[in-house]
Amino acid sequence: MTFKLRETIKINHKKVQRIMQWLGLKGKCKTQKYRSYQGEVGHIADNLLQRDFTATQPNEKWTTDITEFKCAEGKLYLSPIKDLFNNEIIAYDLARSPNFEQITRMMKQAVARLEGAKPILHSDQGWQYQMIGYQNILRENGIQQSMSRKGNCLYNSAMESFFGRLKTECYYGKRFETFEQLEKTIHEYIHYYNHERIQGKLKGLSPVNYRTQSLN
C-alpha cells in the first residue's frame, strides 16, 4: 500500500499504518495451509538454498509449493513456481486435486522458460516432490532439486509470502460459489501480481518490470 500511495504523494510506511489504524483497517488473518507431507515416500534432496532466497539473475533459483482454496463447489489447489530473482510467478497450475498431473503441467510451463539455464528448484518435502517422475523431469532438464527440512516453514518462506499476499488481497473475506469464479479470480490476480503489483524489494517496480529493466 505504501508504494502504491507514493506514486502520487510522498508518504512512509509508518504514516500508512497510522492512517489504517485511524480508519479501523486491519490485516486479514491467515488460515491453516495445505500440508502435502506424507512421510518419506521417495528421495529427499539436500537443502541447497539454506534460506538464501536471493538471486542475481533470472532462472537461477526457483521455489514451488501448493496451497488450497475453497468455494461452494469444493476445493481448488494452486501450484506455482516463483523466480527468486524478481519474485515473478513464472509457471502455475490450478487443479481440483493436488496430483502428479498438476505438477507435470506446471513443470512443462517452467521448462519452456529455461533458455539454457539450470536453476535450483526448491520445495518442501511434499509427496509430489519425492516422486521419481518429478525428479526425472528435473534431471532431464538440468534442474537441481532442493528441499526444506521437515516441519519448518521458514525454509520456504519466499513462497509462503506470495500465498499470504494472494489470499489477503483477493480471497479472504469473500465467498466464491463456483470453481470457475474462483479460478478467474486467481488467474487475474497472478497477472496483476506479475505485471502491476509493485514491491519494495524490487525498487518499487512490478516483477515483470524489474526483470525487463535488469536485462536492458
From Swiss-Prot:
PROSITE patterns: INTEGRASE. Transmembrane segments: none annotated. GO terms for molecular function: DNA binding. Residues 54-215 form the Integrase catalytic domain. Keywords: DNA recombination, DNA-binding, Transposable element, Transposition. GO terms for biological process: DNA integration; DNA recombination; transposition. The keyword Zinc does not apply. SUPFAM superfamilies: Ribonuclease H-like. This is Uncharacterized transposase-like protein HI_1721. It comes from Haemophilus influenzae (strain ATCC 51907 / DSM 11121 / KW20 / Rd).
